[in-house]
A protein has these predicted regions:
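A conditional alpha-helix N-cap/helix-loop micro-motif detector
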Residues: 103-107, 129-130, 176-180, 217-218, ...
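Membrane-anchoring hydrophobic helices of lipid-metabolizing enzymes
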Residues: 2-127, 162-163
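Catalytic core of membrane glycerolipid acyltransferases/transacylases, capturing the structured
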Residues: 76, 119-178, 207
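Short, contiguous strand/loop micro-motifs
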Residues: 11, 100, 123-124, 173, ...
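Non-catalytic C-terminal accessory region of glycerolipid acyltransferases
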Residues: 118, 142, 146-148, 180-307
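Residues within well-ordered alpha helices
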Residues: 61-63, 139, 164, 227, ...
Length: 307
């Protein structure tokens, strides 16, 4: 009985999701960019307010100076509103190449990707769960870069709704997401000189502690480094910034030097390079990285040891 109830719940969720996809795609097609945004923002603002109405304000944890900005109910509501708005793009990534969307995302550091492609090297794009990270690969694919994201879990767990959304992704001939039980597919994908989009701030898998800023370390997953070594790929830090009103900036930092990408190397050097490239963006937009930083930062005591 429980199994039947679970399947019914999933079916209802998929049906609701399919309905929302159809609605968003219809509205996007028939409204101008400005009208579409103006329609959705007040709706999502109310939804975010209701979502935060009964949540208590938690005491602020100890954090580096650049993250010590007040976390009021208002800031949480606005942040949640932006998440809802940015998630809408997942319903029509195939339309991001249209004139009304294409100018909304600019890429800095594009030369790093282009050089890797000229040299026939695959690329691992290392990112943190900062800003609208969940739409960066859509924009990259829209611009013609064959990128797939790697996530934990098993491929059988990918929902019917997610598979439906995959059909709308640019470059539909290749997968949108690969899982840890699809390493053969991943090997073939990277051997063809493609791009892998992979998080470095997940709590699963092998971990290491990397110096971050004065008095603080960062707990980092080593998967991106290990895959870059295994497949002789360039390891490039990748961040996306929400600049408001569905405008974005993707920043590609300098690739990690090859001497840091060997099995014998001190991998913390690669980790420090990645974080060093990302830190200026974190400092410029603390509101977009607060959640990720509170999960991964480790404070040192006066003797330089981790607490």
């Amino acid at each position: 009985m429980r199994h039947v109830s679970y399947k019914l719940k999933i079916a209802i969720k998929d049906a609701a999701g399919l309905g929302s996809i159809s609605i968003f795609r219809w509205v996007e097609e028939h409204l101008s960019f400005r009208a579409f945004y103006s329609l959705l923002r007040p709706i999502f603002l109310v939804r975010a307010a209701l979502n935060n109405a009964f949540k208590k304000t938690r005491p602020a944890p100890a954090l580096p100076d650049f993250l010590r900005t007040p976390r009021t109910i208002k800031t949480r509501i606005l942040q949640r509103t932006d998440i809802y708005l940015n998630s809408v793009i997942e319903n029509f990534p195939d339309r991001l190449a249209a004139p009304k969307w294409m100018a909304n995302c600019r890429i800095e550091g594009l030369a790093h990707l282009q050089e890797a492609q000229r040299n026939g090297r695959p690329v691992v794009l290392a990112y943190c769960h900062v800003g609208p990270f969940y739409v960066a690969h859509f924009w990259l694919r829209t611009m013609g870069f064959p990128v797939v994201s790697l996530v934990g879990g098993k491929s059988a767990k990918r929902t019917r709704l997610a598979r439906l959304q995959d059909r709308f992704c640019p470059l539909p001939e290749m997968p949108v997401t690969l899982y840890l039980d699809q390493l053969r597919e991943l090997a073939r994908f990277l051997a063809a000189g493609n791009l892998l989009y992979m998080a470095i701030d997940t709590p699963t898998g092998k971990q290491m502690v990397v110096p971050f800023c004065d008095g603080w370390d960062f707990q980092m997953a080593t998967g991106a480094i290990r895959y870059a070594i295994r497949y002789q790929a360039e390891l490039i830090p990748c961040s996306i910034t929400d600049e408001g009103s569905w405008h974005y900036r993707i920043t590609l930092g300098r690739p990690v030097p090859r001497e840091h990408l060997t099995a014998e190397a001190d991998w913390s050097c690669a980790g420090k390079h990645l974080l060093g490239e990302m830190l200026p963006l974190f400092q410029a937009h603390p509101d977009q990285c607060w959640d990720a930083m509170t999960r991964n930062l480790i404070r040192k005591d006066n003797h330089g040891e981790n607490r």
